[in-house]
Amino acid sequence: MNEHSLIEIEGLNKTFDDGYVSIRDISLNIKKGEFITILGPSGCGKTTLLRLLAGFEDPTYGKIKVNGIDIKDMAIHKRPFATVFQDYALFSHLTVYKNIAYGLKVMWTKLDEIPKLVSDYQKQLALKHLKLERKIEQLQKNNSNAQRIKKLKEKLQKLLEINKQKVIEFENKEKLRREDIYKNLEQLTKEWDLLSQKKLKEVEQQKQAIDKSFEKVENKYKKDPWFFQHSEIRLKQYQKKKTELKADIKATKNKEQIQKLTKELQTLKQKYANKKAIDKEYDKLVVAYNKKDYWTSYWETYTLQQKEAFEKRYLSRKLTKAEQNKKVSDVIEMVGLKGKEDRLPDELSGGMKQRVALARSLVVEPEILLLDEPLSALDAKVRKNLQKELQQIHKKSGLTFILVTHDQEEALVLSDRIVVMNEGNILQVGNPVDIYDSPKTEWIANFIGQANIFKGTYLGEKKIQLQSGEIIQTDVDNNYVVGKQYKILIRPEDFDLVPENKGFFNVRVIDKNYKGLLWKITTQLKDNTIVDLESVNEVDVNKTFGVLFDPIDVHLMEV
């Protein structure tokens, strides 16, 4: 385990039954207390990744480690996560208070320490003493029978001595009970460890046997060069190729050519049938291996889960009503719901409903909070307010937050680090400044904010010649290769308009749009390359300007 990582995702894959690959062998480490945002367009796999973490989906293979333990076979309710959903998922018949408190009904806490239990027991016994003392005081006030008062005082003294002995007995009994529990737990832990080690060896042997079967199947592929040449061929490609060959046969009049194409078609059918049979064997082995990998995960966490179940039964208790009330009150204060406790969800705005959903997840004290696009259904102003509150709650709680969103601005505002995803792959991981200013690819540059992408050649000494001929400079030195072509990124807001021939190069204005605070200006280089920029001042269409920019804002990307 990476000593600084709370979550370690290793080679995680999710392939659905129809063959669609949603998550493609991704790996990611998340530190304790981080605010991580998984950012990408619809269908990129970000929500699937969140569902895999929460346990709503099972991975095809790979590992999801929390505190060094693979949890992919762990039940949802045992995972250290709580989820805030986009659609709130509130109970419509319960008040705000009861919605938030709902999860506490099944929440357990450690048994109180023995001194606390003894103190509580003493308080119970003291109530009896108090009743007797009050009775004596009342009799004395009323000048009642002195003999009766004397007897009651003797009774009180005797009760004090008896209860003192009871407290000692109670404390000794509780100590012995706990000693027995801990001894039993120690013995059971040894037995669980032995069993899990035995089972892990058995599973490892079974996996090794499957590995040998993999080798046999791979040898079948190696026997025929055709399989290597067509390793990626699938049903659609096969049908397309078959249709093309049939069309060629039909269109050809030359007998020799017809025979050649017919033979090629027969070979294709035979080879594809053979490959399909071998693929089927291979796929069966993959399924078998992945099942064994789940058993590996199960037996690796077996002792821990058995120990937790034992401790819950013998060394834990449910929360008292007073404890529940305090937790709910604290979280209501934290998320800004004070005064709304008795309202029903239908009486709340969208922003308030999302606060309730957030409070309900926070109150159960998860180690990690998963947020599935919780702000996407809210209007812009409410969303921005809640973004600020989310940041404050994250700082106050110290929890690890994992947010899924397609909103680039939201990701840049909230995150410690951003994970950019597309088509099931992680493309880049970095802090918001790195992701925005130094994207690894043109796709990321265009997805996050607006981007001007130029083609150019690196000349050395931090100089670049654009395809249109202009020479510009960068402050970034990343061992770029002299003479190599790169794609150059400059953001629209990094340009400054100056009079013609006073800048690094000239542009002609071809369009303008007012955005409120700024004008979005569309311009053109002399080779017709489009350059978008922003200006606080309105400019005239068809007018030519020079442009300036800081070399540090010039970023090079691989072609």
Swiss-Prot record:
Any one GO MF annotation of this record: ABC-type polyamine transporter activity
GO CC, any one term: plasma membrane
The protein's enzyme class: translocase
Localization of this protein: Cell membrane
Domain of life: Bacteria
EC annotation from Swiss-Prot or TrEMBL: 7.6.2.11
This protein's record includes keyword Cell division: no
Known catalytic reactions: ATP + H2O + polyamine-[polyamine-binding protein]Side 1 = ADP + phosphate + polyamineSide 2 + [polyamine-binding protein]Side 1
Membrane disposition: Peripheral membrane protein
Family: Belongs to the ABC transporter superfamily. Spermidine/putrescine importer (TC 3.A.1.11.1) family.
Record-linked PANTHER family: SPERMIDINE/PUTRESCINE IMPORT ATP-BINDING PROTEIN POTA, SPERMIDINE_PUTRESCINE IMPORT ATP-BINDING PROTEIN POTA
Subunit record text: The complex is composed of two ATP-binding proteins (PotA), two transmembrane proteins (PotB and PotC) and a solute-binding protein (PotD).
Identification of the protein by name: Spermidine/putrescine import ATP-binding protein PotA
Organism, as annotated: Mycoplasma genitalium (strain ATCC 33530 / DSM 19775 / NCTC 10195 / G37) (Mycoplasmoides genitalium)
Lineage: Bacteria, Bacillati, Mycoplasmatota, Mycoplasmoidales, Mycoplasmoidaceae
